[in-house]
């Protein structure tokens, strides 16, 4: 299934290569490779495969999950769709505090609730782990994370391990 998703990402032009003018990721890293997983939302056949695979990963690796939390902004639609497939509630974490009472978590999250974070892409895992920290600070039990794509960077793997978070 992963090979089918990888091929699908290439087919829809989500994975871009440019060795002459590298992409600058949100982390500041310059890379000749960029994956725009938002494009899966406009490719229904691939979107269905991606969301079903994410749902399968949640069921297999995090069977005790009670709620899915998407990362802003690209993880939000995937969390919503996977939540629909699994009949689970979903919410998301804002990247910055909202003006109204500084609220960062949208949706109802109860202390002690078992959470799976839904992310579109992981490089250094910095933004993903910021979401994990917000959730833990709110009393959630973060079981782990699922993502569409990871660059498999050592820094990201090390950051996830240091935070005690598994990504599948």
Regions found by a protein language model. Give the residues of each.
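Electropositive phosphate-/nucleotide-binding environments in soluble metabolic enzymes
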Residues: 3, 44, 48, 52, ...
